Amino acid sequence: EDFVPLLEPLAHQLPNIRGYLLCREAPQEVATSLPLVGEFETLLAEQPSHYDFPSFDENGVATLFYTTGTTGNPKGVFFTHRQLVLHTLGEASTFQAPGFELLNRDKVYMPITPMFHVHAWGVPYTATLLGATQVYPGKYEPEMLVKLLVSEKVDFSHCVPTLLNMVVSAEAI
């Protein structure tokens, strides 16, 4: 819901988007001109317990993210389904190394690296595969991030140095 006011003035530039999915803690109405398809938790609860996934080409494009432009202008990079699965499996084997278990069913994970930044390094996919509880902060406000880290008893997180500096400089610490 935090991004609705940012998306509304841009919606006319996004003609291929047929609807928006709202993600929030509690389902409630949001006043917006955007075509909402629903709220994530409500839609999830309404789904049948079984779903027959359609076949698709593992080499087909699955996602698009943008580089930060470290060596030039930012650019879009496509990832295939196969690349995401192989990355997730490789990362999972590392995160499950004996004596090094960063993520598993008993762990709580909260990314501070946003998904648009290199898929948050792919860790959300790995956390899902390994059954970790996941906490997604929404806005990147330092005090709120610190409160979530503590209140949700986060075991594992990651971020870029700029965000880490914001968090450790927060008044809540």
Task: Name each model feature, range by range.
Residues 1-10, 25-27, 113, 140-143, ...:
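Adenylate-forming
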Residues 1-42:
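Structural core segment of the AMP-binding/adenylate-forming
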Residues 40-41, 59, 81-82, 113, ...:
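Structural detector for helix-capping/boundary residues
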Residues 46-66, 73, 99-108:
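Conserved pre-ATP/AMP-binding loop-to-beta segment of ANL
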Residues 62-90:
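Conserved AMP-binding A3 loop
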Residues 85-108, 116-156, 169-171:
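Conserved AMP-binding/adenylation subdomain of ANL enzymes
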